[in-house]
């Protein structure tokens, strides 16, 4: 009788797979709810991996599953509500997870699908620096290949859920999906609110049915005691702590799901950078333990550990986060700040920390510094260094700024909403700023370097500079950052080898030092060394080097403001605002027209006004942050004004003055390539020999050139005699037969202008204007209009000639001498 019972799970799985193809989505979910309620865990065990994969898609991205990243309530309301009810933290799927959790089932998760650094580290037989992987790695007898993690149902579900964000292919650009409206984003928010509550405690696991077995309050692998939490908890201690049982402390079971969820999200979403960087961040003490553990594992497997170069070779794929990925990480950071700030004042005080507190309260204190800070810093560095120089960087920027402002998510923030003035950053946030110093200073410098390479005339780029400047200009924030830098730069005079013990913080180490300042200095140094290594070279944010960069940015802001004003003037004077009659005038298009300026020409005056407003406020904020004087900013404006041409509109590319003139800087080359700036260069040669334009008929221009050249050679003497007369006929001939006076042109060198000495040419006739498409079109239109009034071609031609002669006589009378007239 055992045979049919053993075949039952396979039959159930086959039935569900068939239903997934034949039944509609809502009906399938209803059937799954009944299956979860009616069948015991032993029969659901085989269904669970298939169900998870069918929901979140395969780890290789081939199967999309329910496609939660594109599922929106306003587009597919029925499917959206059904999926959200099924996957809710209190929904049927989590009941299935808890039912399997109670029976202590494990599921294999392939190591090859983990983030690159973790995968390479495990394949090198090195335990990653995260409690999430302890006691879970299953090394095969042959070693090397086919590694798996033995995960409990909750871990397995969360691994798939988190990895589906990055394993699935990016959404098509043709799909207009707002990330905040999609089902995946909403589920992340619900899971964070459920397992990281800002009020009350974590809800207990739900029993799947009254007759079923209730889930165990403890996971298969117990969470480590929070007494061992620190900036860098010992790997060996963590390894030992995971060997022990926590059944003696039932209160610690309250937060194991919260801890697991946070670790999974951080590891899957933030742990993406080179293995070399990962190893660089390890403290010397941790590296010794890693080496000891690697030797132990290698000895147990009877095979030598792979060298680190092979691990680095195995991790060669470059990881580029998507905008959707960054937005989800920002949601995580905002919720973590609210979660950590939900501690009551008496619980958050150091004195309360020394007394007995609940595991959830300890977790609130340790969540950000213990799990998030290090990986987020390197993740942000990667984004700042590799993200394209376009407006999509706004997502990364807002994620960074959200982390820098935990006070925005504090409970007292609600009472500040009605005050339009920026509130002073309280001194109680000084420890957070000091322990996250590099997040403020080094990443600010990285942003400066990006801003110096972007087109600040674009309103989106101007907005990003404004946002950063506004955040750092909050009252008292710059002072606290500067105080943190002073603490880090404080010389170490007491313990010469203190840097080797920065990552084993104990009371015995701190006791011989002065109580307040040295302790704060020690924490800042610990933070910097843990993220950058002990051989890092720190550049102060308020030092002379960064101040030079800020002045450079201020100069670019001033340039951008002037360019925006110039574009605004050109917008008013653009051809779209000219009259129809002015378009009908004969003549060539300006041969020295400038490059296409900026997308502002197409956006309009409103965006130009916003750009000027953003840049003006950003400049003021930078002046407040770095205490720039009005004289310095005025000097920048004066220096820029001297580099502009006579009409006060066009600006030169960025350059320096050398011995032989101006030399382009890298920024200047960037400005020329992108059409942001140009040198004012005019054609100085024979106007008749200019290249044929796209608006001209090539064969006709060449024929007219040969005809006019023959006429000029044949009648050169007569034309010269006519133009030399001092009467009206002479002025009339000079108006038509004299070319532009080359003696009035200049070599437009910004360093020094000098006149050009060119040999004078005699009067000559130019018929090139007749080779223009526009001229021929106007003539055809004139003949067509004349035909409507029953005027023949010959009569129309005579009228056109007569009209032009009258126009030329009027222009001759108004002209004192021959003027520049390009035909």
From Swiss-Prot:
Gene Ontology process terms (BP): cellular response to tumor necrosis factor; ceramide biosynthetic process; in utero embryonic development; sphingomyelin catabolic process
Entry cofactors: Mg(2+)
Family annotation (InterPro entries): Sphingomy_SMPD4 (IPR024129)
Record membrane topology: Single-pass membrane protein
Localization (cell): Endoplasmic reticulum membrane; Golgi apparatus membrane; Nucleus envelope; Cell membrane, Sarcolemma
Phosphoserine sites (modified residues): 130, 245, 749
KW Metal-binding (keyword) present: yes
Residues making up the signal peptide according to the UniProt record: none
Chain ranges passing through the membrane: 776-796
Modified residues (Phosphothreonine): 665
Gene Ontology CC terms: endoplasmic reticulum; endoplasmic reticulum membrane; Golgi apparatus; Golgi membrane; nuclear envelope; sarcolemma; trans-Golgi network
Keyword Transport recorded: no
Keyword vocabulary terms for this entry: Cell membrane, Endoplasmic reticulum, Golgi apparatus, Hydrolase, Lipid metabolism, Magnesium, Membrane, Metal-binding, Nucleus, Phosphoprotein, Transmembrane, Transmembrane helix
Superkingdom of this protein's organism: Eukaryota
Regulation: Activated by phosphatidylserine and tumor necrosis factor (TNF). Inhibited by scyphostatin.
MF-aspect GO terms: metal ion binding; sphingomyelin phosphodiesterase activity; sphingomyelin phosphodiesterase D activity
Pfam family, one: mit_SMPDase
Enzyme Commission number, as recorded: 3.1.4.12
Primary location group: endoplasmic reticulum
Catalytic EC class: hydrolase
Protein role: Catalyzes the hydrolysis of membrane sphingomyelin to form phosphorylcholine and ceramide. It has a relevant role in the homeostasis of membrane sphingolipids, thereby influencing membrane integrity, and endoplasmic reticulum organization and function. May sensitize cells to DNA damage-induced apoptosis. In skeletal muscle, mediates TNF-stimulated oxidant production.
Protein name: Sphingomyelin phosphodiesterase 4
